[in-house]
Amino acid sequence: MEELVKQRQKLMPVRIQLSASFNQTATDFLRKQLGIKNSQIFPAKAPLDLSFVYGIQDVTREDTLLYPKRVPQNSPQVSETRPMLAQIKKQDILLHYPYQSIRPFLRLLQEAAEDETVLSIKITLYRVARNSQVIDALCRAAENGIRVLVLVELRARFDEENNIGWSRRLQRAGCEVIYGSRAFKVHSKLLLITQKSRTGVHYTTQIGTGNYNEKTSLLYTDLSLMTANQAIGAEAEKVFDALCADCLLYT
């Protein structure tokens, strides 16, 4: 995957985007040199790079120019004082991003990393935040002697380099890291926490539609279900077994 990322810098161009006032002679020269057809040339009247707008926003910072700030709310299902694992054992908790905060999920992961009854944490990762609390919690769990299995999908488009870096950090912390199958991308969002119990083991499962990413949870509409339903936990265990059996062939 690292080699493929490097090769991306040397791939053949597929289009030219330029200013509508760009010199026609220079345009023809570029088209011939790059082997581009006229249909692959896109003149634009607007600025090609709008990143300068962020600088203007920081300088002006006029509230009248900005949308009203929306802050994710705390879920009425969640107590701020009781442990998340205990709350989920009592009832399923469904979070709706970005209207509700991702904080209960982060608390679940952070508390599990410090819980002596937790035997293992298994999770699939596709895209995570730059300063990821999820990665921090997984590393902390591994350092505390908990078995942590992380399936990292390296082919998350344009996040390949980031995911390679996260994989190395997880491995240094003692996590078991496997990668996606050659046959398909692993795009599922699945977390399974296994605890010791009087009768054997107890599963706590999280299933969601959105990435484990604190930043994008503020923007994208997604659902996140946290449940202690043991049938769902057993199914999640089978999913991880199947993914591991397939992915280990290529890891």
What residue spans do the PLM features occupy?
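N-terminal localization/anchoring segments of enzymes in phospholipid and broader phosphate metabolism
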Residues: M1-L249
